A protein has these predicted regions:
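Conserved N-proximal alpha/beta basic substrate-recognition cap immediately N-terminal to
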Residues: 1-59
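Active-site "cap" helix and flanking loop/linker of ATP-utilizing ligase/carboxylase catalytic domains
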Residues: 144-197, 229-254
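Conserved metal-phosphate-binding beta-hairpin within the catalytic cores
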Residues: 123, 188-221, 231
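Glycine-rich phosphate/pyrophosphate-binding beta-alpha loops
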Residues: 10, 91, 148, 216-230
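Short beta-strand-to-turn element immediately C-terminal to the catalytic PLP-Schiff-base lysine
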Residues: 63, 94-99, 134-136, 204, ...
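Active-site nucleotide/adenylate-binding loops and adjacent lid/helix of ATP-dependent enzymes
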Residues: 39-128
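Phosphate-binding site of ATP-dependent enzymes
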Residues: 98-182, 209-211
Length: 254
């Protein structure tokens, strides 16, 4: 085969190890390179890179098994908070915590997922969620995500009807949409990505500021996925999107 189409998600597909193995074996593949995947999989590293690259992102800190019971006031964080594994995908193990009981329960649950050894906490930002697909370094139209159950979790991502998705958004002015798209492109470049990926943003209800939450190295490509919706709004049929990904990957790998 000329190239392998990467359609994996979570740690096995997005942490860069498979990409590095393919590089060593001389196997061509679609999607971002191993470095971009490795950097984006670690949520704390991603935050640090975003901050130095001028990409707005919520502050955050990590906890290990040894520090997981540290009091919140000692950490300088206050409820409500988001708790999530430092390295995982598909929103698995993400919890919104409004009470201390919720928080400590979420911490312990997060450490139980796939032998997680590090968990990230960050302030919970109430707001509207937007996905910014990036293809060949250029932002696609934004997709607004309105989860039916309040959180765009694993079930809502992969279940038909789990969320309403509006592309392009009608609730956000054109200027802010463009600012988010440019921030998505900066995030893509800062993480040394190539070919395609998807940056997830939230616009705060409190002050209207936007924040990049994370970068998805291999965004979903199912019928219910966000990247194909954004690409369609940009004029790509599904087959054309796949062809564009293959062509960009061939350029990057050869």
């Amino acid at each position: 085969a000329d190239i392998t189409f990467m359609a994996l998600h979570g740690s096995i597909g997005e942490n860069g190890k498979l990409q590095a193995t393919f590089d060593n074996l001389g196997i061509k593949y679609t999607g971002p390179n191993s470095l971009g995947c490795t950097l984006s999989m670690n949520k704390l590293v991603t935050k640090q890179i975003f901050k130095t690259s001028g990409v707005p992102t919520p502050r955050g800190t990590s906890l290990t098994v040894k520090t997981k019971d540290t009091r919140l006031d000692e950490l300088g964080y206050y409820l409500p908070l988001v708790v999530k594994p430092c390295s995982n995908g598909s929103s698995i193990g993400v919890y919104i915590c409004h009470t201390e009981e919720d928080y400590y329960d979420a911490i312990h649950k997060s450490f139980d997922i796939d032998n997680t050894d590090e968990v990230v906490i960050e302030p919970f930002i109430k707001g509207r969620e937007f996905a910014c697909g990036i293809l060949a370094g250029k932002a696609l139209p934004l997709v607004e995500i309105v989860p039916k159950d309040g959180l765009f979790d694993y079930a809502n991502k992969y279940q038909a009807g789990g969320a309403s998705e509006i592309c392009p958004p009608v609730s956000l002015d054109a200027e802010t949409q463009e600012l988010i798209q440019r921030a998505g492109e900066r995030a893509f470049e800062a993480l040394r990505m190539d070919v395609y990926s998807r940056a997830d943003f939230i616009v705060s209800d409190a002050d209207g500021e936007f924040y990049c939450l994370e970068m998805n190295a291999l965004p979903g490509m199912t019928a219910a996925s966000l990247l194909p919706k954004a690409a369609k709004a940009a004029g790509y049929e599904y087959s054309e999107l796949c062809e564009a990904i293959i062509q960009e990957s061939m350029k990057a790998r050869y």
